[in-house]
């Protein structure tokens, strides 16, 4: 048997970033991109990213977003769910391999989804549901070929109006069995789609359709939008409701980077309570690889929080930083100061 390798799920960009890249690709004629592109939206669930991978050489193994996990080194019980449903997952892999002609002696299939429900995340209707795994993607990789370009498989195919890659009785769902959305975006004038994106995102935030179908009403997080092109590649972005946005912006779904008057305004806009709480969740509750996992927060831990928030801001707000000619040297001291103040109030 070969040693399993962690196969990460890509970070999902914001609307303004992904659509800017799409517009540039169209200009450069990198791909045959039409003037109007249809995106399919699925409900964004507020939990923790997990996955199950399989090839004939590695066998089946589990992952959190950043680590390979197992029954000893688990992520809030996810591996236990997979172990109890081993036959179901083995069946999923065989169905996908047969449908898409995937040679599992060569390739690895990774089924990605959101592990969500009680005690995993707060502030959403999902917290009142039993823990469940909701599948939303499957990726094909070749771990022995560094030049191989990974690609995505459609997991939405159905039999009798129910997704095949799911086992609802075991609380293994498929996001395509729940409400989905469509929007057509004009590449050269994608601000035209801003209002509809805002309306749909607010609709999901007001009452999560996933939770509602399972019998609970309450706040949702947002929508993930996908458009496939070429050889099973895709464009993907997210839109979040106001309660779950980690940056303050003048509009819910911005299409351009915002101008800021000074460093303090940038830090106030980006080093928010939501981003701070997201850091605490990840460092203390979600990531078993964190040295502070399942520990009680203490003031001496603050540098871990600062580092996480700093890195997240630099990743998510790179375009705003460049647009406003801000340097990391300018913002890091202000971020650190604000994080320390917020951390003191939660101890």
Where on the chain are the PLM-derived regions?
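Core nucleotide-handling region used for phosphoryl-transfer chemistry
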Residues: 1-347
